[in-house]
């Protein structure tokens, strides 16, 4: 039976335990996700308390991380999403995303509306990918793909 969480702290505590186990076992998120049939980003989001895993994926991930049955069950529960405190992020990486939306948020909104009309980009019917690519000018670049279904506003 599908279960839902109403307290975000239990999943945040589990995320801390998962990250500790991940570090002790020297595993990458890609290695943990391998064999689940799910995207690395989706499994990572679940491990960090933002998504629910199907039972078979939760068991596989749990085995890789030596999680107990309660933790495996928690990974299958629908979480209380959006666990970032209601303030401007202070973590430098998260802040840069906040900054990108401060600078380009209105541009993204205008371009989405111009190309699609009045509506939103779904974060439910959504895919996320992060790639590391060489920068022709030296160093490396992050290519982040946000792939969400467009949902039009419907008059009623």
Curated annotation (Swiss-Prot):
It holds the Pfam family Cyanate_lyase. Catalyzes the reaction of cyanate with bicarbonate to produce ammonia and carbon dioxide. The active site is at 96, 99, 122. This is Cyanate hydratase. One of its GO terms (molecular function) is cyanate hydratase activity. It comes from Escherichia coli O139:H28 (strain E24377A / ETEC). Keywords: Lyase. HAMAP family: Cyanate_hydrat. It comes from the Bacteria. Belongs to the cyanase family. InterPro entries: Cyanase (IPR008076), Cyanate_lyase_C (IPR003712), Cyanate_lyase_C_sf (IPR036581), CYNS_N (IPR048564), Lambda_DNA-bd_dom_sf (IPR010982). The lineage of its organism: Bacteria, Pseudomonadati, Pseudomonadota, Gammaproteobacteria, Enterobacterales. The keyword Transferase does not apply. Its EC number is 4.2.1.104. The gene is cynS. It catalyses: cyanate + hydrogencarbonate + 3 H(+) = NH4(+) + 2 CO2.
